Amino acid sequence: MNKFLLASIAALFTWNLQAQFWSEVDSDFPTESTGISRFSIVDENVAWGIGYNGINPENNIQQFSKTTDAGSTWNAGSIGIGNTNLGIGDIAAIDGQTAFIAVYPRIAGQNGGIWKTEDGGGSWAKISQTEFTSSGSFPNTIHFFDTDNGVVTGDPVNGNWEIYTTADGGSTFTPVPAANIPAPQTNETGYLAQNTASGDSIWFTTSTGRIFHSTNRGLNWNVYQSPISDFGGSEVSGDISFADASKGILQTNAAILYSTTNAGQTWTQIVTSGTGTPYGDNIAYLPFTSYIVSVGSDPNFAGSSYSVNDGVTWVNIDTKQHVDVAFLNTSAGYSGGFTSDTNTTGVFKYVGDVLSAGDEFAFAKAISLYPNPTRNELNISGTDRVLNLELFNLSGQSLKVFQPSHSLSLEGLPTGLYLLKITTPLGMQSIPVLKN
């Protein structure tokens, strides 16, 4: 095992760096220069994105595009919400049929809110008339942790942040009490689609450079000051992403990077190296890995790049315009592009193996078993990352299915060698377990 891990570590630095990374496919938006400002990836087959006008973002677009075949083809559709002046700020997809959107007012006197589709985007309905109804209400972000639990964040209203949670699949949303959220600073607001999540933890960023953080799906919040003064200003802006509940990265519009290992409470500037550079727009950690992808859309500083060591060393991928970037794991990831008259552009689909060559190493860092060999009890670390545990004998027969837990009982099983199949967001791996 140790030799294998050492070989995996060495492989991190010996990949073919010229391997293909992106495959550009048609986003199916009908108008040229339509971009994708936000992705929501459900699984390796299903992902949704929302469109925007790449020539003049002030020209409102109410459109989505969706794939159900792992990004090979995308089908665009209109978001019919009954008012063409409302903006589509963020999207949270549940499956190929169901998705939620955060809708914001673009004209004074109107109200946004939360809309939902249950027929693949064919029709959209407002959840209720009770959320974001004040004159200053402005929904910014929406995220679902699973099919039942979600959170929507908005700007402050009457001196308090307007945040709602749901635990019933979006049938009802409950306001988070002001006592559970640190008070806003003077003129502080949030930003459209500027949130990131890992497990039960979620973060959103603000106009004063602060980062709000919840560890319980939005029910309670803490706030930390970041190294920058604004996450969406004309002079200073930034983006954040987290690999897990603690490890994160912050990228500024000047391509300066900061890292955190305590969920964003403190940040340390990264001294970068390598032949490439991070870009100044969006950044994405691949969950539970050391891999990061950075993208930029500024025509004077456009492109994409990646790092395999938490943002220290960078390799350039291309110099095309990229908007949003999102990864589910080491095999499913997308970046937003723009449509063209050739009907061949709009979505960058990850097709390489650059970010999967070190899966064994990343998996080993995420999960550990001890003691191994064992008599009866087997302890497991990193259970917050475990989706499923199943024990097999060497003949391939399933013996036990465990609920994710810190301790697994092998009592009643004869001594011998077994295989524990562990499923995490990184994929599946079978680890030998010896019972004495």
Outline where the language-model segments fall.
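Asp-box/BNR beta-propeller loop motif
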Residues: 20-29, 57-80, 113-131, 162-182, ...
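Residue-level detector of functionally pivotal "anchor" positions at catalytic/ligand-binding pockets or at interdomain
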Residues: 350-370, 398
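Bacterial Sec-dependent N-terminal signal peptides
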Residues: 1-21, 357
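Short, glycine-anchored, charge-dense loop/turn motifs used at functional sites
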Residues: 392-398, 418
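Conserved blade-ending motifs and adjacent loop-strand segments that build the rim/top face
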Residues: 277-280, 314-328
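C-terminal tail/sorting-segment detector
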Residues: 417-436
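Entry beta-strands of beta-propeller and related beta-repeat scaffolds
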Residues: 45-49, 97-101, 148-152, 200-203, ...
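Short glycine-/Asp-/Thr-/Trp-enriched loop segments that recur within the blades
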Residues: 29-36, 81-88, 131-139, 181-190, ...
